[in-house]
């Protein structure tokens, strides 16, 4: 939560729920995933409902989750009421996949569109993908230049100062990271060399923070009817 707080604290007002996450060992067995994930989803749904009833006060909102949290965001998108979705600024599904285009899932096309879903998974190349995280994904965008084509973007690693190249592969919908030479990214148990799942937040935290503010300001400027009355 320290990293999340650094990214979201300040001008952004955020609500982060406690919920029962499954262990990494769970992902080694499909039967364990099927048995345990409903508990996590149930906790997040209840927490989101509590947030709407006690903290949101009719305001527009952003959903954001990473990895297992991103799975929960997809679940919320697929189960929320239309009236709730009408106040959604954007949903950030980071380090996971969107495999079903439900009524409330619209892929982001640029940096400022609204009611959309942002999704990406970072790898060195396609051979480094983890099927659990990205197989069958239908939604992707480059979080540096906010394009959905293969136009590359330069990114300075906020932790080390290294200059990286970030390119969306439009066939696999994986985000290719060029120039990363460190070995501090391996995901325990199910990770592999060249899969940058553990960097999906830290590399792009500044990009995400700025984009959340941009989309929120855009929503407020064009959708005053969605704002609570004084």
Residue ranges and their predicted role:
Residues 1-26:
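Active-site machinery of serine-nucleophile hydrolases
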Residues 18-22, 65-67, 93-97, 123:
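Active-site-proximal beta-strand/loop segments in catalytic clefts of secreted hydrolases
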Residues 25-26, 71-73, 100-103:
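Extracytoplasmic/secreted cell-surface and envelope-processing proteins
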Residues 63-73:
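Gly/Ala-rich beta-loop-alpha elbow adjacent to hydrolase catalytic centers
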Residues 45-57, 78-229:
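Surface cap/lid and interfacial helix-loop subdomains adjacent to catalytic sites
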Residues 34-42, 67, 198-202:
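Soluble non-cytosolic domains of exported or imported proteins
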Residues 13-18, 62-63, 90-93, 118-119:
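Structural recognition of the beta-strand scaffold that forms the well-ordered cores
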Residues 28-59:
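Helix-loop module immediately N-terminal to the HCX5R catalytic loop
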């Amino acid at each position: 939560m320290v990293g999340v707080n650094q990214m979201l604290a300040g001008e952004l007002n955020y609500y982060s729920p406690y919920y029962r996450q499954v262990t990494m060992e769970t992902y080694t067995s499909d039967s364990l995933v099927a048995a345990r994930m409903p508990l996590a989803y149930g906790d997040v749904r209840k927490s989101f409902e509590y947030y709407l009833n006690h903290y949101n006060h009719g305001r527009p909102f952003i959903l954001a989750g990473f990895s297992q949290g991103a799975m929960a965001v997809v679940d919320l998108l697929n189960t929320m009421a239309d009236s709730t979705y009408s106040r959604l600024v954007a949903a950030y599904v980071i380090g996971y996949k969107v495999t079903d285009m439900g009524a409330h899932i619209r892929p982001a096309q640029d940096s400022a569109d609204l009611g959309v879903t942002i999704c990406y998974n970072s790898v060195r190349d396609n051979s480094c993908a983890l099927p659990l995280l990205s197989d069958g994904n239908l939604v992707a965008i480059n979080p540096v230049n906010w394009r959905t084509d293969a136009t590359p973007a330069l990114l300075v690693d906020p932790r080390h100062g290294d200059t990286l190249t970030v390119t969306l592969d439009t066939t696999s919908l994986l985000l290719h990271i060029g120039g990363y030479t460190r070995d501090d990214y391996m995901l325990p148990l199910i990770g592999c060399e060249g899969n940058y799942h553990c960097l999906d937040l830290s590399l792009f935290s500044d990009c995400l923070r700025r984009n959340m503010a941009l989309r929120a300001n855009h929503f407020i400027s064009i959708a005053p009817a969605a704002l609570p009355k004084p």
